[in-house]
């Protein structure tokens, strides 16, 4: 079953509404470390190993994004979340498309971390 993908325009609209989706920044190490920005309110989740979702709420939609225009990493994470019963999708075009559209961003200093064990990839 293909992983649902959400457009940057639809995600922007949903983030402006109350109860918008939870964003997961799942960029690989190098692209993440060489960037100074992220999507607003995103949690950092290392996209390696087995996904531990114990700290991720099941009552929210989740959108994973990466820096790959083909959403390879974010699709893998979203597929695993769906397998575990979450409502998850991948951002079409990743953060690159988001930045190209000049949509809102935050500096990584504002990055909120997921709890160390719950919600992290091991």
Q: Where are the language model's segments positioned?
A:
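Rhodanese-like catalytic fold shared by cysteine-dependent sulfurtransferases
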Residues: 1-17, 21, 29-63, 68-122
């Amino acid at each position: 079953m293909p992983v649902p993908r959400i457009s940057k325009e639809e995600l922007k609209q949903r983030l402006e509404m109350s109860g918008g989706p939870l964003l997961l920044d799942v960029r690989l190490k190098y692209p993440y470390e060489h960037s100074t920005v992220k999507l607003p309110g995103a949690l950092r989740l290392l996209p390696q190993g087995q996904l531990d979702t114990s700290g991720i709420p099941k009552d929210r939609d989740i959108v994973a994004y990466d820096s790959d225009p083909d959403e390879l990493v974010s699709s893998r994470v979203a597929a695993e979340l769906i397998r575990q019963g979450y409502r998850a999708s991948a951002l079409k075009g990743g953060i690159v498309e988001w930045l190209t559209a000049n949509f809102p961003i935050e500096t990584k200093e504002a990055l909120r971390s997921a709890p160390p064990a719950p919600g992290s990839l091991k």
